[in-house]
C-alpha cells in the first residue's frame, strides 16, 4: 500500500475501520490552491518519509492534527475507493471517531443482492465509526467499538456478518479488530484529543 495512504488512513482512520480505505492504493493527483492545513499535512508526510530513510531517524514526535487530516481527505490528498466520500475525523485519548458518506452499492457491486442482510447495507448512508486505536512496537491496532448508519447503531452481529462476507474477502487483513505494521519506521502512534503523535525509530 502507498505510504501516504498508510499514514493518513491507518494512523488517522475512518475508512480503514470500515475496511474501505485499504483499497486506496495511490494518492490523488496534486492540485493548486490548497488550504494551509492541507499543505501542513503534506509537509509532515514528506518529513516522515525523509526521516524514515535515515540510518537513525529523529525520534522527535510528529503531530498530525484533526484539521490537517480532514483537509487532506477533503482536498484530495488521498484517492479514496469508490463508494467512500466526505471523510471527517475526530479523536480523543485512545479513540477515533470517524464520519463518512458510504455508497454500499459501489462497494458491494451487486454481490449479495439476494441475501436479506443486503437490505441493511444498500444505498447511500452517513456512517459513523467509533474505534479504539493505538500503535506500539511498530504495530498499529484498531478495534471497532460501534458503527452507526444514519444515526442508528448497527447490531454487532450484523456488522460482523457484513465484514466477514463483503470486506475481509477483499481485504484479508481488515476485520472488527485490525492489526498492521506501521509504515515509515513509525514505532508508536498515540491518539490524543485532536491529534495523533507519531514517533519514528
Regions found by a protein language model. Name each.
Residues 1-7:
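N-terminal secretory signal peptides that target proteins for export/translocation
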Residues 8-21:
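Bacterial N-terminal signal peptides
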Residues 23-201:
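Extracellular/lumenal and peripheral-membrane lipid-interaction modules
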Amino acid at each position: 500500500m502507498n505510504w501516504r495512504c498508510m499514514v493518513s488512513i491507518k494512523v488517522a482512520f475512518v475508512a480503514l475501520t470500515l475496511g474501505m480505505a485499504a483499497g486506496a492504493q495511490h494518492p490523488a493527483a496534486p492540485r493548486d490552491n490548497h488550504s494551509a492545513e492541507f499543505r501542513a499535512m503534506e509537509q509532515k508526510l514528506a518529513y516522515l518519509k525523509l526521516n524514515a530513510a535515515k540510518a537513525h531517524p529523529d525520534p522527535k514526535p510528529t503531530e498530525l492534527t484533526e484539521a490537517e487530516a480532514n483537509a487532506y481527505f477533503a482536498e484530495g490528498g488521498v484517492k479514496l475507493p469508490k463508494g467512500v466520500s466526505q471523510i471527517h475525523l475526530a479523536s480523543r485519548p485512545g479513540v477515533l471517531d470517524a464520519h463518512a458518506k458510504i455508497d454500499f452499492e459501489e462497494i458491494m457491486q451487486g454481490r449479495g443482492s439476494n441475501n436479506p442482510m443486503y437490505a441493511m447495507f444498500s444505498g447511500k448512508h452517513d456512517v459513523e465509526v467509533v474505534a479504539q486505536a493505538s500503535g506500539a512496537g511498530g504495530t498499529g491496532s484498531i478495534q471497532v467499538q460501534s458503527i452507526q448508519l444514519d444515526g442508528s447503531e448497527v447490531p454487532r452481529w450484523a456488522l460482523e456478518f457484513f465484514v466477514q462476507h463483503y470486506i475481509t474477502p477483499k481485504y484479508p487483513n481488515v476485520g472488527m479488530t485490525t492489526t498492521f505494521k506501521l509504515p515509515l519506521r513509525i514505532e508508536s502512534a498515540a491518539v490524543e484529543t485532536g491529534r495523533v503523535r507519531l514517533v519514528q525509530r
